[in-house]
């Protein structure tokens, strides 16, 4: 079975609406990541079939919860979840931020090959990045603890903006230890087809 057919089977198990062109772009992204990974070690996931589940599906299930127009993916690594989400949301603007040059080179190549016009790749440490305009949502997928994410990223959302952290199990202890300037809003349970283990999306705002 081809990657495209496999992706279709996975998407069919969700309520996501994905166009044929977007499916092609998602598969292209996996093929490119697999190719670059052999030389640059961008992800510990080596199998393209597993990349579909652990990287693509795990990212795009967040799509229905993206409210706003401007998003920043902090500590994006090889563009996850930012690139898959940008493919599904061509009307929204994404900044993908990471401090490692090899990751940014991959992202820029992906933007070129996939023809994505709604993504800006930025090489910077998150605490040093000063955007011209604040963001509606700050996204993180593999960025340390909630405390660290909020501490380093608190200058990024505008007053009405919020934080979305993609987590495994519900991080009860981390939420209990939030600083007083932050408020836990909700945790959304995410269903990622064929992925073992829990996934949740934690929403937090500044008070």
UniProtKB/Swiss-Prot annotation:
Enzyme class at the top of the EC tree: transferase
Reactions that this protein is recorded to catalyse: guanosine(527) in 16S rRNA + S-adenosyl-L-methionine = N(7)-methylguanosine(527) in 16S rRNA + S-adenosyl-L-homocysteine
EC number(s) stated in the UniProt entry for this protein: 2.1.1.170
Location of this chain's protein in the cell: Cytoplasm
Tagged with keyword rRNA-binding: no
Main subcellular location: cytoplasm
InterPro entries noted in UniProt: rRNA_ssu_MeTfrase_G, SAM-dependent_MTases_sf
GO molecular function: rRNA (guanine-N7-)-methyltransferase activity
Superkingdom of origin organism: Bacteria
Chain sites annotated for binding S-adenosyl-L-methionine: 75, 80, 126-127, 141
Record SUPFAM superfamilies: S-adenosyl-L-methionine-dependent methyltransferases
Keywords of the record: Cytoplasm, Methyltransferase, rRNA processing, S-adenosyl-L-methionine, Transferase
GO CC list: cytosol
Protein function: Specifically methylates the N7 position of guanine in position 527 of 16S rRNA.
Family listed: Belongs to the methyltransferase superfamily. RNA methyltransferase RsmG family.
Descriptive protein name: Ribosomal RNA small subunit methyltransferase G
Source organism of this protein record: Psychromonas ingrahamii (strain DSM 17664 / CCUG 51855 / 37)
Phylogenetic lineage: Bacteria, Pseudomonadati, Pseudomonadota, Gammaproteobacteria, Alteromonadales
This protein's encoding gene: rsmG
């Amino acid at each position: 079975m081809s990657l495209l057919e496999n992706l279709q089977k996975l998407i069919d198990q969700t309520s996501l609406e994905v166009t044929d062109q977007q499916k092609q772009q998602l598969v292209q992204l996996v093929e490119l990541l697999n190719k670059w990974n052999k030389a640059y070690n961008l992800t510990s996931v080596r199998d393209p079939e597993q990349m579909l589940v652990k990287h693509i599906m795990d990212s795009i299930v967040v799509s229905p919860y993206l409210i706003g127009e401007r998003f920043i993916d902090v500590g994006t690594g090889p563009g996850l979840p930012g690139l898959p989400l940008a493919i599904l949301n061509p009307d929204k603007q994404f900044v993908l931020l990471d401090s490692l040059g090899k990751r940014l080179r991959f992202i820029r190549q992906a933007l070129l090959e996939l023809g994505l016009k709604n993504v800006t790749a930025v090489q910077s440490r998150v605490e040093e990045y000063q955007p011209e305009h604040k963001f509606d949502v700050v996204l993180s997928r593999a960025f340390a603890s909630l405390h660290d994410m909020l501490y380093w990223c608190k200058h990024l959302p505008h007053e009405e903006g919020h934080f979305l952290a993609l987590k495994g199990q519900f991080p009860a202890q981390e939420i209990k230890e939030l600083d007083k300037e932050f408020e836990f809003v909700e945790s959304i349970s995410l269903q990622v087809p064929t992925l073992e283990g829990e996934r949740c999306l934690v929403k937090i705002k500044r008070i």
